[in-house]
């Protein structure tokens, strides 16, 4: 068994989640990787790693997977809530089912993970929860109304729960990336919105890479437990909004 703490990462099958898994594995941590695409998790081929097919909107699935990992690696030391969806559209034309999906994954998916691990962390008086939000949780963007709303919620409840957990030496960090070169945009169904977004990305030169965000997550975690980095906002230098 590793002498380093267990790291749980949701949405770990690609993008930021996959890069974060690789970063923590390189640092010597045992991992529990959660996602709906089990084959993509297993393709990472990381040592001391348990891969589980989990839907973050199902709290029981998260709890079952974490219980299994803790039996092998010990208690969760850090939870990285990374799973999320971005479905862009205008409020009067977007399918409300897409709103519901974003609310369930981006808000409830994060809260479900917190609910499963927080009590144990408070009891042990040690632990870190890192929630991957977005710069869209701090300001609004065209076609992003509900997505911005879900990410604003992540910022709000992360800060409030951080206050509740601070006296137990449990840390909460919000990571708010700008435009990242990932699969996230592929969820959007409007070709025009996707095309416009891609044109906007071109104005930035090079968007963030998943590894850039993963390095920020690892940096926040690796600070001494007495230091809580509450929020990291990182964007391409040429991203003007």
Can you say where each PLM-predicted feature lies in the sequence?
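The beta1-alpha1 cofactor-binding region of Rossmann-like NAD(H)/NADP(H)-dependent oxidoreductases
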Residues: 54-64, 96
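C-terminal helical subdomain
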Residues: 170, 174-175, 195-240
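Active-site helix of classical SDR
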Residues: 114, 150
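Conserved glycine-rich cofactor-binding loop
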Residues: 13-14
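Conserved glycine-rich Rossmann-like NAD(P)H-binding loop of the short-chain dehydrogenase/reductase
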Residues: 27-42
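Residue(s) in the substrate-gating loop at a strand-loop-helix junction
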Residues: 134
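Substrate-binding pocket helix/loop in short-chain dehydrogenase/reductase
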Residues: 90-91, 95-100
